[in-house]
């Protein structure tokens, strides 16, 4: 008896890529024109015109390498876009200029000292652009022949490469044959071979072989057959940070320590040797220093020892631009009894350029909510948008933005194509803001644990 075999095609499931939306994922730059004038709404940045222009001037100086070893302080109330400005600076600088983000509380660790943690952050924010000339063989593979010995122990072969102008046959050893097999190089592929290291890079498939197969994978890339000589000299530029050079030279396992993350304390003598070697490369024209940016958020959480270290470290020859952010007013310097603006000692404040941020107006708040809703794929009705903007003024911008996702979910539950006022009101009813939560804490203070304070006789009572 024949088995019943289903001939229906199997159903294919769409696997959607999960994309996390960050708090600042809508920011793509500072939103300035060529004259460093802030646009009203550009690259995800709204308002804060003076602060954005000041940040643009600083970035221009960073790109020209003229402002290393300086300190900038972004001071302003919470929810005024200090971290957003730092993210915009990251996007504007690009990947070639090192940008290190650090929260002040990350400095305190049981494994390494505070000064070592700050030193590593400083060294990560300094890039070294190393130039080297390499000889490359680039061409289209015509034929690969592999000859095996009778015993099968050794392999030899020949590789035929061509450009539009010439064709050459190269003899191959066993290691090169293994490399070709590892990269799955076939006739018709365009390859690049580094003569010094023997590394083979597969650039793509030649346009001339585009019709060899009826179906090809999505990752198949077609490139033109190279022209001119097969052997060319190219200048390759690598950008690494000083910290990466420190780690590679401090451990026996070398660069593997970079991936392990367990760098530990690095000796000052080793750093001095590396600084000397980098200075030697600069004199020979082999390398150049790329001063980056170190951003320290919540800087008031650092203590007096960290601040005294920063005083000295910023005057070092190899120092990045240090950007700090604080939302404190006159507050106590951690580790002392003294108060100071922003919780930073006066001698360090004197070395800083201070950028102040102000609270957003209602129109700016509305535009920010609109951009965030678009980023989160939420359709807001005009009335809901106005309500969220008003909430942002009365409570805080973060609370208003945090209500977008719950409101959208409530709208989906009632099968509505867009989020309306009633959804926002329902979310407002479910989730308290800071003021309502504080009011609730006061009303229920008798049932909640509070702080205790000592009175006569050392007896403790509820505050």
Swiss-Prot record:
Family: Belongs to the RuvB family.
The keyword Nucleotide-binding belongs to this UniProt entry's keyword annotation: yes
Protein name: RuvB-like helicase 2
Binding site for ATP: 76-83
Swiss-Prot/TrEMBL GO biological process terms: box C/D snoRNP assembly; chromatin remodeling; DNA repair; regulation of transcription by RNA polymerase II; rRNA processing
PANTHER family documented for this protein: RUVB-RELATED REPTIN AND PONTIN
This protein's encoding gene: RVB2
UniProt cross-references to InterPro entries, sorted A to Z: AAA+_ATPase, P-loop_NTPase, RuvB-like, RuvB-like_C, RuvBL1/2_DNA/RNA_bd_dom, TIP49_P-loop
Subunit structure as annotated in this protein's UniProt entry: May form heterododecamers with RVB1. Component of the SWR1 chromatin remodeling complex, the INO80 chromatin remodeling complex, and of the R2TP complex.
Location of this chain's protein in the cell: Nucleus
Role according to the record: DNA helicase which participates in several chromatin remodeling complexes, including the SWR1 and the INO80 complexes. The SWR1 complex mediates the ATP-dependent exchange of histone H2A for the H2A variant HZT1 leading to transcriptional regulation of selected genes by chromatin remodeling. The INO80 complex remodels chromatin by shifting nucleosomes and is involved in DNA repair. Also involved in pre-rRNA processing.
Keywords: Activator, ATP-binding, Chromatin regulator, DNA damage, DNA repair, Helicase, Hydrolase, Nucleotide-binding, Nucleus, rRNA processing, Transcription, Transcription regulation
GO MF entries: 3'-5' DNA helicase activity; 5'-3' DNA helicase activity; ATP binding; ATP hydrolysis activity; DNA helicase activity
S-S bonds: none
Keyword Disulfide bond carried by entry: no
E.C. numbers: 3.6.4.12
GO cellular component, as recorded: Ino80 complex; NuA4 histone acetyltransferase complex; R2TP complex; Swr1 complex
Protein origin, superkingdom: Eukaryota
Catalysed reactions, as listed in the record: ATP + H2O = ADP + phosphate + H(+)
Organism field: Cryptococcus neoformans var. neoformans serotype D (strain JEC21 / ATCC MYA-565)
